[in-house]
Amino acid sequence: SPWPRRVSPFLVPSSIINMISGHVSIKFGFKGPNLALATACTTGLHAIGQSARMIEYGDCDVMVAGGAESTVSPLGMGGFAAARALSTRNDDPATASRPWDKDRDGFVLGEGAGVVVLEEYEHAKARGARIYAEITGFGLSGDAYHMTAPNVDGPRRSMQMALQNAGINADQVDYLNAHGTSTPLGDANETNAIKLAFGDHAKKLVVNSTKSMTGHLLGGAGGIESVFTALAVYHPKSPPTINIFNQDPDCDLDYCANTARDMKI
């Protein structure tokens, strides 16, 4: 028979994405809103942004939010390689992820997770919590354009919506942790979107891609990059974008090339 003789009783539960957050809630006794998102590379960031809004709306006082991914496998590597999304600089893997460099040729697949504890401000103060940073605004959008090809309108609107939600002007932003995947189309598109969203102030921004050091964590990217951003605000210091050896003239912003920078954020 072509059919399996036995199916595990754990087959269905193990394939439901929100079982992950369910296990966390059971382990720690979390009884507030419990949900899981799956929005590809923005999963972690969407989870954090939506959790912040739940706190803002009064649905809860504390949320644990972020993203994780483990895709370094024959199937994961093969799929992205077939899509020609990965760098082929296999003879020099340490410099293969090079966002905004003229010779970038794709991203490096990474694995990992980034999770933050979000807490209502007065609640955090009352228990003497160490506060690393504050989420003041969140924006998300779609460009209704193409399944994989980038478009400037979607990210532009997302950034402008975050500014509007935060109630601040573009010139009040000092630092931007960008997507910066090291793909030829994506990095140029993101640069143009930043310039459209921030106008003349874009040239004064410090923009960096921590993917130059971690690789692309896919669903975990937004989580770990939110951690990096919070720590950049807390210390205050911009992480570098490493491996910029020959900056692409079409990517003409300040990417904090190769060296971390002390700065007010």
List each model region and its residues.
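Short glycine/serine- and small hydrophobic-enriched flexible loop segments
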Residues: 52-53, 119-122, 227-235
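Condensing-enzyme catalytic core mediating Claisen C-C bond formation in acyl metabolism
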Residues: 91-166, 174-175, 244
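Flexible, low-complexity linker/loop segments at domain and module junctions
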Residues: 166-172, 202-203, 254-265
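Acyl-CoA/ACP chain-elongation machinery
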Residues: 61-105, 138-152, 180-187, 204-254
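Conserved small-residue
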Residues: 24, 44, 51, 80, ...
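Short, well-ordered amphipathic alpha-helical segments that serve as non-catalytic structural scaffolds
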Residues: 20, 47, 119-121, 151-167, ...
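Conserved catalytic cysteine-centered active-site region
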Residues: 1-50, 59, 82-108, 194-223, ...
